[in-house]
């Protein structure tokens, strides 16, 4: 996979997700939903948005005349949303908010042209009220899905319904878990004729 972005994207060696980057990219390229399981510290949270950028997702990769959309990346807690955004921006050597930013209650560090938006799952849930098809996004990463909060459970159900409909076949969904719940999450997203 060639890097379509103007960014220099590096993947720290030693992280399991970096080591399996090609496999993850192939899965993202071929499937609408992928489930990534890996323990804490495997690089899921920081490397998956960079992999999505490498696949041509996010506003900075929009072609002329194409609707520019973001990579949405949910975190269960506000502090995680802001610290993960800072970390990814640092790894991409870009100012916080320019390419990667965050939005949490009472705080928004996101430029109009940002490609990756870190947020709490509650923020994304609230956005379903004003943007029911989640048109602002070309990719949604639901991180730490094993935490099974009401917000996460509702979002997973909402996304499944959205993907079943005819209007968002372009949307990619990545669900991450620190536990081996892959089969349960895959069954949740499997359609009658299409396994997840």
Model-inferred region functions:
Residues 1-196:
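Conserved P-loop NTPase motor core
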């Amino acid at each position: 996979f060639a890097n379509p972005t103007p960014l220099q994207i590096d993947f720290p060696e030693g992280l399991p997700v970096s080591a399996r980057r090609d496999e993850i990219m192939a899965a993202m390229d071929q499937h609408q939903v992928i489930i990534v399981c890996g323990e804490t510290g495997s690089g899921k949270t920081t490397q998956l948005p960079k992999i999505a950028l490498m696949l041509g997702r996010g506003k900075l990769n929009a072609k002329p005349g194409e609707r520019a959309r973001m990579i949405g990346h949910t975190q269960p807690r506000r502090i995680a949303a802001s610290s993960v955004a800072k970390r990814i921006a640092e790894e991409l050597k870009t100012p916080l908010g320019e390419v990667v930013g965050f939005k949490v209650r009472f705080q928004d560090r996101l430029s109009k042209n940002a490609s990756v938006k870190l947020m709490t799952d509650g923020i994304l849930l609230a956005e379903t009220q004003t943007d029911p098809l989640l048109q602002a996004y070309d990719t949604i990463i639901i991180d730490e899905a094993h935490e099974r909060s009401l917000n996460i459970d509702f979002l997973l159900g909402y996304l499944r319904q959205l993907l079943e409909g005819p209007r968002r076949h372009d949307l990619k969904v990545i669900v991450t878990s620190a536990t081996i719940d892959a089969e349960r999450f895959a069954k949740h997203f499997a359609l009658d004729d299409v396994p997840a």
